[in-house]
Swiss-Prot record:
Binding site for ATP: G63, R64, N65, G66, A67, G68, K69, S70
Classification via PANTHER family: TEICHOIC ACIDS EXPORT ATP-BINDING PROTEIN TAGH
Function: May form an ATP-driven O-antigen export apparatus, in association with RfbA.
GO MF annotations in UniProt: ABC-type transporter activity; ATP binding; ATP hydrolysis activity
UniProt cross-references to Gene3D superfamilies, sorted A to Z: P-loop containing nucleotide triphosphate hydrolases
Example of a GO biological process term: polysaccharide transport
Protein name: O-antigen export system ATP-binding protein RfbB
Gene designation: rfbB
Coiled coil: none
Highest taxon of source: Bacteria
Keywords tagged on the record: ATP-binding, Cell inner membrane, Cell membrane, Membrane, Nucleotide-binding, Polysaccharide transport, Sugar transport, Transport
Primary residence: membrane
């Protein structure tokens, strides 16, 4: 079976502007010296990573902060492009990569539901049909008609996942944004993700909560120091990871 996510020999680099803040004078008065300092400096986010995800499979990316997990999700979601290698996906992708992503701070929660759901591929009529279910899932009550600039991080997470819960993706990508919600809402989100899995949705998931990873995922990709360290069954890789972190 052809994988629905193919992450092949992927490297992602970013320009690194060393001491750019303190170097403003040099940029103005000594531009040649400043550009020599800046030239060629790069930050390596991930290096030569490969993995595939089959249709209906749930895979977690784990690793320390800064290892390259979120970069990998952004590449699969198509938000960023690889420096080297290739990333291919097959089907509709729904992603929740950061709090407030796809939302406008001056619009109300209700208005942002229309905006975000449209970005995720729903037609306006479909959004209208699902609006009450989205609002009920969010547990935001009267705040749904307030501008989201007044929302807490937990409220933003609730709004974002509530929209996700009512779309019909082929691939679902979730970053560690659920960690900011309250415990009962987190449990509801995990239940929804597992329901997506039962429907055959492919899931790519980042979490530091190994219990959630064990409950949701078939396999785990362990990224360490920007490179692939291990890939295998959730049970085996989680045990290795816990031993390494002890």
């Amino acid at each position: 079976m052809e994988p629905v996510i193919n992450f092949s020999n992927v490297t992602k680099e970013y320009p690194l502007y060393h001491h750019i803040g303190s170097g403003i004078k040099d940029l103005v008065f000594h531009p040649k010296r400043a550009f020599q300092l800046l030239k060629g400096r790069k930050y390596l986010a991930i290096e030569d990573i490969s993995f595939t995800v089959a249709k209906g499979e749930a895979v977690a990316l784990i690793g320390r902060n800064g290892a390259g997990k979120s970069t990998s999700l952004g590449l699969v979601a198509g938000v960023i492009k690889p420096t080297k290698g290739s990333v291919t996906t097959h089907g509709r992708v729904a992603s929740m990569l950061e709090l407030g992503g796809g939302f406008h701070p001056e619009l109300t929660g209700r208005e942002n539901i229309y905006l975000n759901a449209t970005l995720l591929g729903l037609r306006r009529k479909e959004v209208q049909q699902r609006m009450e279910r989205i609002i009920e899932f969010s547990e935001l009550g009267e705040f749904i008609d307030e501008p989201i600039r007044v929302y807490s991080s937990g409220m933003l997470a609730k709004l974002g996942f509530s929209v996700i819960s009512q779309v019909e993706p082929d691939i679902l990508i979730i970053d560690e944004v659920l960690a900011v919600g309250d415990i009962s809402f987190q449990a509801k989100c995990i239940k929804t993700i597992r329901e997506f899995k039962k429907k055959g949705v492919t899931i790519l998931f980042v979490s530091h909560n190994m219990s959630d990873v064990e409950r949701i995922c078939d396999r785990v990709v362990w990224i360490e120091n920007h490179r692939l360290r291990e890939i295998g069954s959730a049970e085996r890789i989680i045990e290795l990871y816990k031993q390494a972190m002890a």
